[in-house]
Amino acid sequence: MHGLHGPTIPADCDGADKAALIRRGDAYVGRLVASLQATAAWKGTGNMAIVITFDEGAGKTREGCCAVTPDAPSNFGGGHIPTIVITNHGPRGVTDETPYNHYALLRTIEDAFGISEHLGHAADSDRGVRPMSALFAVEP
């Protein structure tokens, strides 16, 4: 578990069997998603989304997103991380090549709740932060 290691609990990232850790995490996320999709709320008429993002990159790149060069002081992104969006009423199999970062996800959530004063870098449209709208499209 990230951040919970100590004298008697090994740091997962330093463990010898990383493949087993990946399998354990994958199985856990699979069970969690299945349990959420089994709820009445998920099966209802309201629009729901599950967002899965993994932000523990290998740290081998400072390459950011949103037209910011890697060595620029304004680079607030870094690395390539996967994000999966599962919606209950949206189209399936959508991929989006737009580069996003954590602020884009925050911006998307704020927009969904009608919050127009965005927090921190989520407001940085001039630096390329855009909502992830294509991944949350809802079919009529």
Stretches with model-predicted labels:
Residues 1-140:
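N-terminal pro-sequences and low-complexity stem/linker regions of secreted or lumenal proteins
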